[in-house]
Structures are given as structure tokens and as C-alpha cells.
């Protein structure tokens, strides 16, 4: 099969822990043709959705470990039509760019896309699960989402638990997630500013 991964730059991977690398490695082990690209490299030319791709050069023997595979991987650059792939894995880190989803809309009836484009739209951030029905509170922790600083300060002040979790709606891999303990709530103003203003990179 011809497999494409829309992802973050290859050079930024952490080989020891990156799940996308493992998918690419496994695809190569199984003999599939692999191409990678980024959101910034999607384009439309003559009404055809294309990508400036990096095509993985097939190796006579694929290294057994993802780390060695990463070190030895060689690519050749090529402009390819997205509809020419059998499968496209959407592996870009959140928050997702709606323009990328619009590009994928144009070929979703021709290519199998993982994950589904509409599913990506609906579950683009942590609001998706926070709004799910869990009347008994047995699955989803009590969750407060707001950009109203005074409201959040009242929530924190009156919270009976000794610990609370603070996290941005967007982000990935635990980025920006902290445990707020009762004894550390004196600096809550600066923490809320960090999350609400988005100064923490992926925070909002």
C-alpha cells in the first residue's frame, strides 16, 4: 500500500517515545511505500490536492528498532497527489488547523483517512469529553472550563479536594498539565493568567 503520514517535522521526533515513528517503522517493516508531509506542505494545483512529500527510500533490510530506523531513514522529495495514497494517517499535533481538514475534505471519498475528518473536527480538543453525559460522575472527573478568571478563582477557593488538575484545552503529551495542591494556591493568579492568555504556548 501507499501510506502517507501528515505529521510534524521529522527532525523534531523523539525516537525513543514517538508513536508516529512506530507506525511509520511498522509500515516499512510490512513493505508498504511510506511518504511523510506536514500541514504547511499541503497545496492545491489545477484543482488537485497535492503535498510536497518526503518519500521514504525502501531499504533492503529495515532496521528492527524504531531508533535505528530513524537514524538510517533516507527520503527523496516529491510532489504527490493525496488521492494517490491508499491510506492517510493524520498525525499532526493538536490543536488541528481547520485548513488541513478542508484539504482532507477534498479527498475523503477517495482515500481511507485515519482518523475520520468529521471525527477530528468534533474531538479537536478536551471539550469533547468534558461535555459528555456522566450524571453519576463515575467516568469523567468534575470539570470546569472557562476563561473567566474570577469564576475560576472561586471554583478553586471552594474546592474541597486537596488537589486539582489544571490543563489547557489544546496541547498533547501532558504539555501544560499541572497538579495544583492546596498549599500552593497562593499563586493561582499567575497560573490562571498563564492558561487564559495562552502564554504557555499551546495553552488557552
Give the role of each language-model region.
Residues 1-4:
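Extreme N-terminal starter segment of soluble prokaryotic enzymes
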Residues 6, 89-92, 168:
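Short, well-ordered coil/turn residues at beta-beta hairpins
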Residues 7-11:
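Extended, domain-scale alpha-helical bundle/helix-rich regions
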Residues 12-142:
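Conserved N-proximal alpha/beta basic substrate-recognition cap immediately N-terminal to
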Residues 19-20, 149-165, 169-204:
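Phosphate-binding site of ATP-dependent enzymes
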Residues 143-148:
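Short acidic-hydrophobic, aromatic-tinged amphipathic segments that line or gate anion-handling sites
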